[in-house]
């Protein structure tokens, strides 16, 4: 399996995350991609190639233009104020407040953000653009017809990024951008299977009223897990998209058997949908030792995940999302990919 990777991910090297009432070193950091890449290479998974540049048209096909411009200029505007730290959201347009976009950068950061754990540093925009190129290079390669599966080692991740909102370590929605690219290049039906521990609120938001992209997510119950306000089973799509969104929230302590039963249900729905391509939002923070999650999957379980997805015999793009146990992160990711490859 070919892996797409860009060194530009290192530009996203934030020093600040608000977690448990404290400012901590971010869980989402450059070492994550390094660890996964090292495992890909040590296991001889396949060639590792750099992406070409795809421009901004695929981004603007899904994301609000004002939001994209905000991300592009956020660090410059923030640093010009004289602030010495990273841009952290502190004020939001809460219930019954105006939804106007402020002029001052502090207000803009709040307006366009989901949550306060994700700061913006100097290289965030450049890294997010490169991550988008990584996923599109993977999509392009998969559509060439020479590969059954491709791995886009995206960093920063993307599935929490909505139409006009960043957060959850995400800025541009890589999986959604790839899905739209497939649609624009002749694939009538695309399925996005999100196996990250956290619900992909951003991906759901982007496709919630569409019938041509099926979104399925297996995740921690939002009553107990981030992002808390998205991912309930009654969220099934709206208007033309009614019935094209499926959520399987699961409680703390969920073991692989329960999780796998939900995976099998989701794969059956993908098969019934008749997807021409599957995009897998590959988060491995379902692992039992993950520091910010509460499922109990073991490393060997990720082999089963790859095998089950492969049984659908559909072209599949794996897109890196979460996973924060650095000791076994690479093992868990590559287990999925190797098992899929057979």
Regions found by a protein language model. Give the residues of each.
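HDAC/HDAC-like amidohydrolase catalytic core signature
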Residues: 1-193, 198-342
């Amino acid at each position: 399996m070919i892996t797409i990777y860009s060194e530009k991910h290192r530009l996203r090297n934030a020093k600040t995350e608000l977690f448990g009432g404290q400012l901590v070193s971010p869980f989402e950091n450059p070492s994550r991609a390094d660890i996964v890449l090292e495992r890909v290479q040590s296991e001889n998974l396949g060639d590792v190639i750099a992406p070409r540049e795809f421009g901004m048209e695929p981004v603007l096909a899904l994301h609000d233009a004002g939001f994209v411009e905000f991300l592009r200029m956020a660090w410059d505007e923030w640093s010009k104020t004289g602030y010495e730290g990273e841009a952290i959201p502190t004020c939001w347009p809460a219930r019954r407040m105006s939804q106007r976009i402020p002029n001052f950068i502090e207000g803009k950061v709040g307006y366009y953000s989901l949550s306060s754990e994700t700061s913006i540093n100097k290289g965030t925009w450049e890294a997010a653009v490169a991550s988008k190129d990584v996923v599109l290079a993977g999509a392009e390669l998969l559509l060439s017809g020479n590969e059954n599966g491709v791995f886009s080692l995206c960093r920063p991740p993307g599935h929490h990024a909505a139409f006009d909102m960043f957060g959850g370590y995400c800025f541009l929605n890589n999986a959604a951008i790839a899905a739209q690219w497939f649609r624009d290049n002749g694939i009538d039906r695309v399925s996005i299977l999100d196996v990250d521990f956290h619900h992909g609120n951003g991906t759901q938001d982007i496709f919630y009223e569409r019938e041509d992209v099926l979104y399925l997510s297996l995740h921690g119950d939002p009553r107990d897990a981030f992002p808390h306000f998205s991912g309930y089973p009654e969220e099934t799509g709206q208007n033309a998209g009614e019935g094209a969104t499926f959520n399987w929230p699961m409680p703390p302590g969920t073991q692989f058997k329960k999780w796998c039963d939900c995976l099998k249900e989701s794969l059956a729905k993908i098969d019934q949908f008749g997807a021409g391509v599957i995009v897998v939002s590959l988060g491995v923070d379902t692992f039992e030792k993950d520091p910010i999650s509460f499922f109990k999957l073991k490393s060997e379980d990720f082999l089963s995940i790859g095998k089950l997805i492969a049984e659908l015999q559909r072209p599949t793009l794996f897109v890196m999302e979460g996973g924060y146990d650095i000791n076994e992160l690479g093992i868990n990711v590559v287990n999925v990919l190797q098992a899929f490859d057979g």
